[in-house]
Swiss-Prot record:
The keyword NAD does not apply. Belongs to the complex I LYR family. SDHAF3 subfamily. Plays an essential role in the assembly of succinate dehydrogenase (SDH), an enzyme complex (also referred to as respiratory complex II) that is a component of both the tricarboxylic acid (TCA) cycle and the mitochondrial electron transport chain, and which couples the oxidation of succinate to fumarate with the reduction of ubiquinone (coenzyme Q) to ubiquinol. Promotes maturation of the iron-sulfur protein subunit of the SDH catalytic dimer, protecting it from the deleterious effects of oxidants. May act together with SDHAF1. This is Succinate dehydrogenase assembly factor 3, mitochondrial. It comes from the Eukaryota. Keywords: Chaperone, Gluconeogenesis, Mitochondrion, Transit peptide. It is found in: Mitochondrion matrix. PANTHER family: DC11 ACN9 HOMOLOG (PTHR13137), SUCCINATE DEHYDROGENASE ASSEMBLY FACTOR 3, MITOCHONDRIAL (PTHR13137:SF6). Interacts with the iron-sulfur protein subunit within the SDH catalytic dimer. The keyword Chaperone applies. Residues 1-42 form a transit peptide.
């Protein structure tokens, strides 16, 4: 992400300005503090691994796409608009089979976590 300073200026002229990678990374981790502990741990681990994996990317298109996607994610979690989010058919059609499997696994895990918290909450009554 060495060429990102030039990219910020370019993207700023075309639309929303992109945050520098380190600022975005820190803001996402701060936003995760509002999550329940299990979700926070999962989110923090995922964010850290993704930023680490993309640390040495030099392709400007990949850098812009990566930062724009994470900035959209940050905006969603900081405004709680993720709760009403859905995936369009066109977005799912663009996903690779590996991404669809990951999405399915994530869905299963979140349903299990939701079921476990609902069960533990009902046992306290």
């Amino acid at each position: 992400m060495r060429t990102t300073n030039h990219l910020y200026r370019t993207v700023h002229r075309q639309g929303k300005p992109l945050l520098p990678p380190l600022h975005l990374y820190r803001r996402i981790l701060r936003a995760h503090r509002t999550f329940p502990p299990a979700q926070r741990a999962l989110g923090d681990e995922y964010v850290k691994s993704e930023f680490k994996l993309h640390k040495n990317i030099d392709n400007p298109v990949h850098i812009i796409g990566f930062l724009a996607s994470w900035q959209d994610y940050f905006h969603m979690i900081s405004t709680n608009s993720w709760a009403e989010g859905t995936l369009s058919k066109s977005l799912v059609d663009q996903m690779s089979s590996e991404q669809i499997v990951q999405l399915y696994e994530l869905m299963k895990e979140t349903k299990q976590l939701g079921g476990a918290s609902a069960e533990s909450g009902s046992s306290l009554s």
